[in-house]
Swiss-Prot record:
Main location: cytoplasm
Role according to the record: Binds to actin and affects the structure of the cytoskeleton. At high concentrations, profilin prevents the polymerization of actin, whereas it enhances it at low concentrations. By binding to PIP2, it inhibits the formation of IP3 and DG.
One Pfam family linked to the record: Profilin
Lineage per the UniProt record: Eukaryota, Viridiplantae, Streptophyta, Embryophyta, Tracheophyta
Species whose genome carries this gene: Triticum aestivum (Wheat)
Gene Ontology terms for molecular function: actin monomer binding
Annotated PANTHER family: PROFILIN, PROFILIN LP04
CDD domains hit by this protein: PROF
GO-annotated cellular components: cell cortex; cytoskeleton
Encoding gene per record: PRO3
Protein's cellular compartments: Cytoplasm, Cytoskeleton
Subunit description: Occurs in many kinds of cells as a complex with monomeric actin in a 1:1 ratio.
Name recorded for this polypeptide: Profilin-3
Length: 131
């Protein structure tokens, strides 16, 4: 299965009648493995900040998480494993695997819990597969 198929079939799939607004699978170095068409264009320093927060949990808390110039307030995640952010009625979930970052961005009516489920389920699967 291609990485694009993982984005299309596992991240942008319908869950309880809702879908993520955008999603991507990135390498730890910021390389794009696959992304949905409307995934925000991000800067290398934004990816570096995300990776640093996984290495040093709490790094992004004072400044917020930026992706594509959009600022998300960092909310409770799982240190070193999952970063969660909130912006207005939407937010972001990022799951780290051994080789990749799985990102899902949502807006209402999708709930944070639904986004977490979609992103973390794929991340756990990829970890089990050695990624």
């Amino acid at each position: 299965m291609s990485w694009k198929a993982y984005v299309d079939d596992h991240l942008c799939c319908e869950i309880d009648g809702q879908n993520l607004t955008s999603a991507a699978i990135l390498g730890h170095d910021g390389s794009v493995w696959a992304q949905s068409p409307n995934f925000p264009q991000f800067k290398p320093e934004e990816n570096a900040g995300i990776v640093k927060d996984f290495e040093e949990p709490g790094h992004l808390a004072p400044t917020g998480l930026f992706l594509g110039g959009t600022k998300y307030m960092v909310i409770q995640g799982e240190p070193g494993v999952v970063i969660r952010g909130k912006k207005g009625t939407g937010g972001i979930t990022i799951k780290k695997t051994g080789m990749a970052l799985i990102l899902g961005i949502y807006d209402e009516p999708m709930t944070p819990g639904q986004c977490n489920l979609v992103v973390e389920r794929l991340g756990d699967y990829l970890i089990d597969q050695g990624y």
